[in-house]
Amino acid sequence: SGMILVIISFILFIKVINFKNRDHLSEIKFLIIILCFTITLKPFYLINIPLILLLLLYDKTRNVFLNLFFSKTFWYCLSLIFFIIIYTFINSGCLFFPLVFTCFENLPWSVDFKSINDVKIWFELWSKAGASPNFVVENKSFYVSDLNCISNLIDQYFFNKVSDFLLGLLLLLIILAIVFKNSFGKRVKKDVSFIYLYILLVCFLLEWFFNHPTLRYGGYHLVFLSIFIPFSIYLNQLNIDFKTFERKAVILIFVT
């Protein structure tokens, strides 16, 4: 799943920017490869490209990242992304289907703008609970514009799928809190840098909420990361006995 790969990318990013006195070249290469492969699954995941660019904000990763511009890994990944864009263009006349502003209507094989816009509205309508196998709202364009979908989205989608997902995450947090309860209060000073990453994550969440607020369209991993990154940073500050942790981790895996 692309969402799992994005979660791995975020974890790897946190590792890269917080581990000192290490050569991050191989890890940054791995991060680029993961994101590149994710994009090949769905071009929608191009939105995660800024995650790589964040490396330019950190002194210890900036030079390593810039040096990768001349590496085979970077150019292979760039070529693969370019191939995906060209493939979409050849099939639809759009660089990023169904974004109308990336489409060329005057090409012989191009899909007309009206059809492309209808597809875009339908995708957005479905993701905002405005359509189902046995239901479609009457005024589609009005429904997907601004926040007109909120009341119906909460009624039709939030209180059965999103609420269940949030309760599942809450249960997992409670289980982890019980597992590590003996370590609470035993804090160790550790500087963990993640503020830029979390700002980017919030931007991703806002884009998801306003354009396609369905868990299956990028919501699962964004909600999960927004909750568990701060919790993981807090756990990182605790003085944890890792031998005891290993035993508890095995028990936790069997329980879940």
Regions inferred by a protein language model and the residue ranges of each:
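Perimembrane helix-loop-helix junctions
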Residues: 18, 48-78, 234-236
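Membrane-interfacial loop-to-transmembrane alpha-helix junctions, especially the N-terminal start
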Residues: 24-28, 73, 186-200, 217, ...
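Hydrophobic/aromatic-rich transmembrane helices and adjacent perimembrane loops
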Residues: 1-10, 38-41, 47-48, 204, ...
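Short hydrophobic alpha-helices at membrane interfaces in multi-pass membrane enzymes
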Residues: 15-37, 75
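Hydrophobic, aromatic-rich transmembrane alpha-helices
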Residues: 142-190
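Hydrophobic alpha-helical membrane-interfacial segments at the cytosolic entry of transmembrane helices
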Residues: 33-34, 64-89, 247-255
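Membrane-interface alpha helices of multi-pass inner-membrane proteins
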Residues: 27-43, 47-54, 82, 93, ...
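Membrane-lumen/periplasm interface segments of specific transmembrane helices
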Residues: 58, 71-163
